[in-house]
Amino acid sequence: MAVKVGINGFGRIGRNVFRAALNNPEVEVVAVNDLTDANMLAHLLQYDSVHGKLDAEVSVDGNNLVVNGKTIEVSAERDPAKLSWGKQGVEIVVESTGFFTKRADAAKHLEAGAKKVIISAPANEEDITIVMGVNEDKYDAANHDVISNASCTTNCLAPFAKVLNDKFGIKRGMMTTVHSYTNDQQILDLPHKDYRRARAAAENIIPTSTGAAKAVSLVLPELKGKLNGGAMRVPTPNVSLVDLVAELNQEVTAEEVNAALKEAAEGDLKGILGYSEEPLVSGDYNGNKNSSTIDALSTMVMEGSMVKVISWYDNESGYSNRVVDLAAYIAKKGL
């Protein structure tokens, strides 16, 4: 039986989680909470400028969504503790508003009747941060109720950093994410707490910060203090890449690095880590469900132990598919 999921926040990630769940028989979205009315939610679910029209029948019945004949209850409650997850049969809540990333705030969903909460972002004081393919085996149903799915960038970096570290050992590394713009930026110049993110997103390359590299240590403790980096926000609406330059503990060739990454992509990390030897560009990865896809043509080695690896990720679709995978995994291991 599919685990019943509620989504709090029906924005870019919330709607993409819904889309991903439609293709996963182990997960069923039964309720959505968002401060927008059902007609607008239905419209934005059905028509997407990045991912295209949803291949499903979408309509509205009163205040609820109806997708492929199934009713999804819609509410518009600001306080998570006042939601009706228990009455609605919701077992896992996907917290995707971007506002409730502290454990104490996200835990209000538990007060409302949910059994577990997945925060679709880096969190504060969460019970555990999980990156699928890297550390999901650490999940403990008895002690982990509020779980962070980390960031889309950490989901891209961690799987191939794990391969490099397991195979060759990482001494230190610096990463840059070349990241599509998001709703945390301005379309035209407007005030923002980050002076650079205040500038027009579709007109500029914007240097900014990311905690993704340091956050890798949350799922790979052996890399604590060994990775750091930053971000460049670029004028594309979706698909990003991670550029990692790392010093390894042993000398390697580019061929050896690619061989290790390809082996992992075809083995233990299949469906999480992809591997491509084609000369592709960002648009080719729109809709890609992997967390990370190695651009093998870009792998470089200098002086034996310094390696450069580039990996692509659909920062919306790939990440949202991992949220759904995590929900299914939690349901299997115990609520």
From Swiss-Prot:
GO cellular component: cytoplasm
Amino acids binding NAD(+): 12-13, 34, 78, 120, 183, 315
UniProt induction comment: Repressed by CggR and indirectly stimulated by CcpA.
Listed Gene3D superfamilies: Dihydrodipicolinate Reductase, domain 2 (3.30.360.10), NAD(P)-binding Rossmann-like Domain (3.40.50.720)
Catalytic activity of the protein: D-glyceraldehyde 3-phosphate + phosphate + NAD(+) = (2R)-3-phospho-glyceroyl phosphate + NADH + H(+)
GO molecular function list: glyceraldehyde-3-phosphate dehydrogenase (NAD+) (phosphorylating) activity; NAD binding; NADP binding
Pfam families according to UniProt: Gp_dh_C, Gp_dh_N
Phenotype of gene-disrupted mutants: Cells lacking this gene are unable to grow in medium containing glucose as a sole carbon source but presents the same growth rate as the wild-type in asparagine-containing medium.
PTM note: In response to oxidative stress, the active site Cys likely reacts with bacillithiol (BSH) to form mixed disulfides to protect the Cys residue against overoxidation. S-bacillithiolation presumably leads to loss of catalytic activity. Debacillithiolation by monothiol bacilliredoxin BrxC restores the activity.
Cellular compartment(s): Cytoplasm
Active site feature: 152
EC number(s) from the headed UniProt entry: 1.2.1.12
Site feature: Activates thiol group during catalysis: 179
Record pathway: Carbohydrate degradation; glycolysis; pyruvate from D-glyceraldehyde 3-phosphate: step 1/5
Positions annotated to bind D-glyceraldehyde 3-phosphate: 151-153, 182, 197, 210-211, 233
Name listed for the protein in its UniProt record: Glyceraldehyde-3-phosphate dehydrogenase 1
Name of the gene this protein is made from: gapA
